[in-house]
A protein has these predicted regions:
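ATP-dependent helicase/translocase motor core
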Residues: 1-51, 58-76, 93-97
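Long, largely alpha-helical accessory region at the distal end of helicase-like NTP-driven motors
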Residues: 17-19, 250-253, 260, 385-465
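Conserved helicase ATPase core of P-loop NTP-dependent helicases/translocases
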Residues: 89, 107-113, 132, 281-284, ...
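Post-DEXD/H (motif II) to motif III coupling segment of the RecA-like Helicase ATP-binding lobe
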Residues: 151-213
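Conserved interdomain linker/interface between the two RecA-like ATPase lobes of SF2 helicase motors
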Residues: 192-271
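Conserved helicase/translocase motor-coupling segment
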Residues: 237-311
Length: 465
């Protein structure tokens, strides 16, 4: 069994499995709310919404530990489902630490094959490819956790969610809102059991504050093709990378803005989020050519390459890592103090995950500096939800916040939009309210977004003036 533990992790650090892991006060509040949902309301399907960096996995492990204690005569079989191997590995490690059991659970993802499926950390891709329901009864698992539950409205999750009948279903997410309008709340009696969103997490000093600069972009995306909820990556890549003087001018603008807004370039430990591999490599070359040491990582980069990049960034050997499709979920470099959004991000979930990469607390880190390059956008692009997610007061419209100078930011935070960038956003918001589909969507999600009861007066009060 000790060998089984060593398959995944270095088990030389025995202290991890002997120390008690106790919840922080805010985590205990969430655990208490979960218990109340089950004992008072009788709801055993529960959704926890917690900002990136507040320890969703630790909360789930502590909740499962309590469930085992309450059910000593049951096998308490656990199924933990996620869509990335990195998340599953980290989650298994967390559960072993919380349960103080170096042999608890097994992975079933990629090249990992379990000896037992009793306590399993399973990728949704493996579940679908292995005809997993044929191996288990609907009630085989007592406790099922689905991480990043905002993915669960996708067809790939439907078989799992409709087949199994666990005693407890726990959904974890930082953002329950989905771009495609599909609602995940019906899985949970249309309730969020407990939540701690990003503004509250910053106010409680669980995450570091941010200074957010909306920089006017040099490129116009208004004429680019919009389909299936977003821009075409190939078109964005062309304009950012292969458009000759246009791409060079934009890259130069990024460097100029960076030097303008950061206090000391030599202290920067930054991530730059790019649209494609070619774009990331282009930005990396441009920064290196302008004496800002940088690296590039992609979803194809090996674990060794990622570890080396992290070491070089933390040590100050490089200032930036330009990335594509990684550092969204489940990867931590707490020392990151600067984030560049070098592409429009249609998904609110991905935006918050990428922002969250820089919001981790770290010694000698006072705040996160964010540079978001904002150009003229397609009228269907949603600026409003992005900024609303950064504000503590959900009752004020983003348009009003822009005009008033973002008075509802969390403690110690700051949002500043350059003049043209602010105009692009305001024009975009006005256009989105000018079509019927946009209004219907906002009415449908008003209560969930604002926390207020839907009345005509309250809804009209939320509209931009």
């Amino acid at each position: 069994r000790a060998l089984k533990a060593e398959k995944y992790f270095d088990t030389n650090n025995a202290d991890v499995y002997t120390m008690d892991i106790n919840p922080y006060s805010y985590q205990q509040e969430i655990l208490d709310k979960l218990e109340a949902e089950r004992t008072v309301r009788g709801y055993t399907h529960n959704l926890v919404v917690a900002a990136t960096g507040t320890g969703k996995t630790v909360i789930s492990a502590l909740d499962y530990k309590r469930f085992r204690k309450q059910n000593p005569d049951r096998p308490c079989r656990l199924l933990f489902v996620a869509h990335r191997e990195e998340i599953l590995k980290q989650s298994l490690y967390t559960f072993r630490a919380v349960l103080k059991d170096a042999n608890f659970g097994e992975l079933f993802v990629g090249n990992y094959k379990p000896e037992s499926i009793d306590n399993l950390f399973l990728s949704i891709q493996t579940f679908n490819s292995q005809s997993f329901t044929e191996k288990t009864r609907p009630d085989f698992y007592d406790y099922i956790i689905v991480d990043e539950f905002h993915h669960a409205a996708a067809p790939t999750y439907q078989k799992l969610l409709s087949y199994y009948q666990p005693r407890i279903l726990l959904g974890l997410t930082a953002t329950p809102e989905r771009m495609d309008g599909k609602n995940i709340l019906p899985y949970f009696n249309n309730r969020i059991a407990a939540e701690i969103r990003l503004p509250e997490a910053i106010d409680r000093k669980l995450l570091c504050p941010f200074q957010y600069f909306g920089v006017t972009d040099t490129v116009d995306l208004d004429a680019l093709k919009w389909s299936a909820g977003g821009y075409q990556k190939s078109e964005l890549e062309h304009i950012y990378t292969f458009s000759g003087a246009v791409a060079d001018r934009r890259a130069d603008h990024v460097v100029t803005a960076l030097l303008k807004y950061v206090t000391d370039i030599d202290e920067v430990k930054g991530l730059g989020f790019c649209v494609t591999v070619d774009h990331a490599e282009f930005m990396c070359r441009y920064f290196n050519d302008h004496n800002i040491p940088s690296m590039c990582l992609t979803g194809q980069s090996s674990g060794e390459e990622r570890a080396a990049a992290k070491r070089r960034l933390v040590s100050g050997e490089v200032r930036f890592i330009f990335v594509v499709d990684i550092y969204n979920e489940g990867v931590d470099i707490p020392e990151v103090n600067t984030v560049l959004f070098l592409r429009p991000t249609e998904s609110l979930t991905i935006f918050l995950q990428q922002l969250g990469r820089g919001l981790r607390l770290s010694e000698d880190k006072e705040c996160l500096t964010v540079l978001d390059f904002i150009g003229q956008a397609n009228r269907k692009y949603n600026f409003e939800d992005k900024f609303a997610a950064l504000l503590s007061n959900a009752t004020r419209s983003v348009s009003r916040e822009i005009k008033d100078g973002f008075v509802s930011v969390p403690k110690g935070c700051y949002i500043q939009l350059e003049k043209k960038a602010a105009k692009y956003i305001l024009d975009n918001i006005r256009a989105s309210y000018g079509n019927t589909a946009g209004l219907v969507t906002r009415v449908a999600s008003f209560t969930e977004d604002s926390g207020l009861e839907l009345t005509l007066k309250k809804f009209l009060g939320s509209l931009p003036s």
